[in-house]
Amino acid sequence: YFSNGEKRDITSMEFSISNFSAKPDAGVFSGDLHVSNFLEPDINVKLVSNFKLEFLAKFLNIEDIEDLAGDVELTMNFHDIIDIEHPEKSIEKLNESYFTELKVTNLSFQVPEYHLALKDLDVYAVMDGHAANIDYFDVKIGNSDLHISGTVDDLPAIIHHTSKDVLTHLEISSNYLDLLELTSPSKDSIEGINEALSNMSLGLSFKSSAKDFTESPNLPIGEFFIDDFQAILKHYPHNLHDFHADLIIEEDNMKLVDFTGMVDKSDFHFDGKFTHYEMWLQERPQGDTKIDFNFSSKMIQLEDIFTYGGENFVPEEYRHEEFDDLIVHGFAAMHFKEKLYSTDVTIDLFEAKMKVHHLRFEDFGGRFHLENDDLLIEDFRGTMGRSKFLVNAELGFGTDTLLKTQDNHISLIASKLDFDQ
């Protein structure tokens, strides 16, 4: 219907279409439209659609996706007020009262460039006002399955590419993730990551603006959290659990505030500052990057950490050793000349006590410099029980004798070495 309203001018005009619908071969479309105040239009729209993707693929002649099938149901209600003289203001307030419901059922397709088909994709997501909620996003790829749910507290801020911080939270889980199958370049290849995860769960949170996320020259700028991570690995026969992390990323620097977790019964705590991390991402880096780090653990069982693929990499007499009250502090500097040219690592604190051998590491530290396949060990010191030592060394690891720049040299100074202990 159409009415010019009580005032009989454009401010009171109303226009409405109710229950309009269409049934093309692709599916069913219906909706309602109501517009009032033609000077500053107040628009209410409801759209409901249910269509089949295989028809759309044929109709649009989509060649990059094969065997596309599935159903999509989309419901949209939105209310917007448009200022004709200042339309940019209405864009700023778009979706003040907005509702969208998306349901995808049994979506499947094959990308010619990838050897695995995506199948059984089911999605249910709702956007109400500014907040978006993903009830479920379930998919199967090859032997792997993935389930995602989550929330975005201000989706329009992302759509409009604003500088406002948006908080996103995701819960990701999987019964089985076959990383080798997923990362291999072809069906018969074994060039991918040879690992598989089972009973995996991961909680992630991000606090970043859409602008910082997409326009950062390096990694997305913002604060990122691992709320929880647990998994069982196929070739690393240990239970990873209670992982948590807080990472702050700036344009050129990043700060790992706290990274904690457990491997079976072993725990770890790590924090650090990374300056000019962008060097690691450049194809031909030039310059220096630095790391300052702390590592600590109440208990580390060596057999928990250094066993992989059925092989134990710890000497037999130390396989059941346990390090208690471990504390490490150090810093590293890496110099790049189109590639990594040299690495300098200094450990100024290393303390721990061994449970089986009844020894304590005290006052351990030193400097290690690696350059051109040459390793320089400078003032590496330590005290273990009644033994106290100081080591300096120059070692060459290059295989080309013509490029060898120095003879190997090791210096050991000890006030006492108690081999019995």
Predicted regions, residues:
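Extracellular loop and loop/strand-boundary signature of outer-membrane beta-barrel proteins
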Residues: L60-D64, F109, D188-G192, Q230-A231, ...
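Short loop/turn motifs that connect adjacent beta-strands in outer-membrane beta-barrel proteins
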Residues: K7-R8, E85-K93, I159-S163, F213-P217, ...
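A short, structural micro-pattern
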Residues: P41, G70, E96, K164-V166, ...
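Hydrophobic lipid-interacting interfaces of membrane-associated proteins
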Residues: Y1-E40, V48-K58, E73-D83, S97-A157, ...
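Short flexible loop/turn segments that cap and initiate beta-strands
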Residues: K93-T100, V166, P217-G222, Y341-T343, ...
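Short "repeat-start/strand-capping" segments in structured domains, especially the N-termini
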Residues: N95, D165-L167, P217-N218, H241, ...
